[in-house]
Amino acid sequence: FLPIVGKSLSGLSGKL
């Protein structure tokens, strides 16, 4: 997976 995708998933998880 690309680093951007990983960051996006991490950001969403953090928001939730």
Curated annotation (Swiss-Prot):
Leucine amide PTM positions: 16
Location (main, coarse): secreted
Record's subcellular location: Secreted
UniProt note on tissues of expression: Expressed by the skin glands.
Annotated GO CC locations: extracellular region
UniProt keyword Secreted present: yes
Taxonomy, superkingdom: Eukaryota
Function statement: Probable antimicrobial peptide that can stimulate insulin release in INS-1 cells in a dose-dependent manner and without increasing the influx of calcium.
Family assignment from sequence similarity: Belongs to the frog skin active peptide (FSAP) family. Temporin subfamily.
Protein name according to UniProt: Temporin
